[in-house]
Amino acid sequence: MKKILVTGSGGIGGVNFVRALKIFSDKFFIVGTDFNKYYLQFADIDQRIISPKHSDPDFINFLNKITEKYKIDFIHPQPSSEALVISQNLDSITTKTLLPPPNVISTDKLETQKILSKLGIFVAKTKVIANYEMISNIFEELGSGPHWIRAKTGAGGNLSLLCN
């Protein structure tokens, strides 16, 4: 039985990743972490562990302790913020993971949109709103809506607002 550690397992991405694993096979023992004790309840995992935030200096050490305790075969960091920290510390991680170098992980949603667009991948029409005065011009340019206003960085739909 393979043992997988899913960080951020309580967020929608983590929940969906775990569901996909369970559809594929029941031969996984899944340890899930999340810093939010309430979100942690959402995932269908075998072991729940409240974690420090990815910005905590002890985050990598925390993951290594879990890896050792549960004999984890693979770490899947779900939110991009945690993937970035783990990618920056690949030499310190004591088990397998599949991550690109930190310079490849973009946490800037606008930059990600530009990269995807240049690769020919369809993306939503995107405009930057730098100040309050630009809002009316954006609606004139894009039409009446609905439109999403999003923060450039963050996870879990943080600061998302649907506007009509």
What residue spans do the PLM features occupy?
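Short, polar loop motifs at secondary-structure junctions
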Residues: 33-39, 80-81
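Short, charged/polar "capping" segments at the starts of alpha-helices
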Residues: 38-41, 135
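Active-site nucleotide/adenylate-binding loops and adjacent lid/helix of ATP-dependent enzymes
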Residues: 103-164
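Surface-exposed amphipathic alpha-helices with a cationic face
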Residues: 14-25, 67, 87-90
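Conserved beta-strand positions in the Rossmann-like core of class I SAM-dependent methyltransferases
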Residues: 29-31
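Conserved N-proximal alpha/beta basic substrate-recognition cap immediately N-terminal to
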Residues: 42-128
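N-terminal Rossmann NAD(P)H-binding glycine-rich loop of SDR-like oxidoreductase domains
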Residues: 10
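Extreme N-terminal starter segment of soluble prokaryotic enzymes
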Residues: 1-4
